[in-house]
Amino acid sequence: MRIQLLSDLHLETEDYTPQAAPGADLLVLAGDIDTTWSSLSLFANWPTPVVFIPGNHEFDGRDIDQALTGLRDQCRHLGIRLLEKETWITTAPDGRRIRFVGTTRWCDFDLFGNEQRPRAMRAANYFVKVMRAMRNGQIFDPDAVRAEALVCKDWLRETLRQTPQADSDAHWDTTVVITHYGPSLRSADPRYGKQPGTASFCNADDDLMPGVACWIHGHLHCRHDYTVSHEAGQTHVVSNARGHGYKHEADHYDGLRCITI
């Protein structure tokens, strides 16, 4: 299965027109496509199925629960498959069953361990102010972000523990995880390195990788393609985030990038 990867297009400000990659079987949108949601219509009637995992900026200035409901409705209308703490199993052209496991997977600020968490959460206050998101009338502050992140992680852990059911619709041969946030410190942006604010972009989810063939993410405005070795073999981690043109993050961006599962 050939999967086209796009994320962090930020079409609310960026002048960019996504194109379908020749020969792709699926398009994955790994979040931060458009804070206004209006550009999601570009992916209606796409020549392949489209899977969308919301990014943090899809919730800017909104109540996150109400926003998720609204996003679901809009994606359903456009024929886009939104995954938030959900799985989707589809059949690849070669007959294999591929399970896609999707969640925004907010940051839990545990990237550098428990002792460094307070510093990481203080650094996150800046990003929270940029988002201006709410939940139940309260600011979606670092404590609220962490609480939701832990719910996402618990769901992800339990889902990845599941075993395929032979000869049923729940059978799968390969698992692909899609999150907006990076799953490992190895996904840190090299421009900024290892600092408290990095925990607002990456999680320490390396322990969840056994059994996962590929982990797709976005959020960091740089591209990644690396392999994590573990007791069960290897996991391919990949991100094709575009970022902002005015920061030169989009220089040499390949919007037709595909990976093969």
Regions found by a protein language model. Give the residues of each.
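Active-site neighborhood of phospho(di)ester-bond hydrolases with catalytic His/Asp-centered motifs
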Residues: 5-7, 27-32, 51-56, 81-86, ...
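Binuclear metal-dependent phosphoesterase catalytic core
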Residues: 73, 77-78, 94, 189, ...
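Active-site environment of divalent metal-dependent phosphoester hydrolases
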Residues: 10-15, 34-38, 57-67, 89-92, ...
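Active-site-proximal loop/helix segment associated with metal-binding centers of metalloenzymes
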Residues: 101-176, 181-192
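N-terminal active-site segment of His-dependent metallophosphoesterases
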Residues: 1-52, 59-67, 135
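Soluble or luminal CAZymes and related metallo-dependent hydrolases
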Residues: 35, 63-67, 144-156, 197-201
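Beta-strand-turn-beta hairpins that frame and shape the catalytic cleft
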Residues: 1-4, 88-102, 173-174, 227-236
